């Protein structure tokens, strides 16, 4: 889990748009966040395996 202070800092409106960054809405992780789902890869994988993300299924080819 991310520090509460860092999550609060990220949620503030930044003075410059280039300073804004994505964070996982579930756990607060700042790296490897899928913008479309607003989830990090770890949370995305957990929820996808449980079937809680509509339209997502395991690929097989």
Swiss-Prot record:
Cofactor binding summary note: Binds 1 zinc ion per subunit.
Gene Ontology cellular component list: small ribosomal subunit
Keyword Ribosomal protein found: yes
SUPFAM superfamilies: Glucocorticoid receptor-like (DNA-binding domain) (SSF57716)
Highest rank taxon of the organism: Bacteria
MF GO annotations: rRNA binding; structural constituent of ribosome; zinc ion binding
Gene Ontology terms describing biological process: translation
UniProt entry keywords in alphabetical sequence: Metal-binding, Ribonucleoprotein, Ribosomal protein, RNA-binding, rRNA-binding, Zinc
Stretches assigned to coiled coil: none
InterPro entries hit by this protein: Ribosomal_uS14 (IPR001209), Ribosomal_uS14_bact (IPR023053), Ribosomal_uS14_CS (IPR018271), Ribosomal_uS14_sf (IPR043140)
Subunit structure: Part of the 30S ribosomal subunit. Contacts proteins S3 and S10.
Name of protein: Small ribosomal subunit protein uS14B
Taxonomic source organism: Staphylococcus aureus (strain NCTC 8325 / PS 47)
């Amino acid at each position: 889990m991310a520090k509460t202070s860092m999550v609060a800092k990220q949620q503030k409106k930044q003075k410059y748009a280039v300073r804004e960054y994505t964070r996982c809405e579930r756990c607060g992780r700042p790296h490897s966040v899928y913008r479309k789902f607003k989830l990090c890869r770890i949370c995305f994988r957990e929820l996808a395996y449980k079937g809680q993300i509509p339209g997502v299924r395991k690929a097989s080819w």
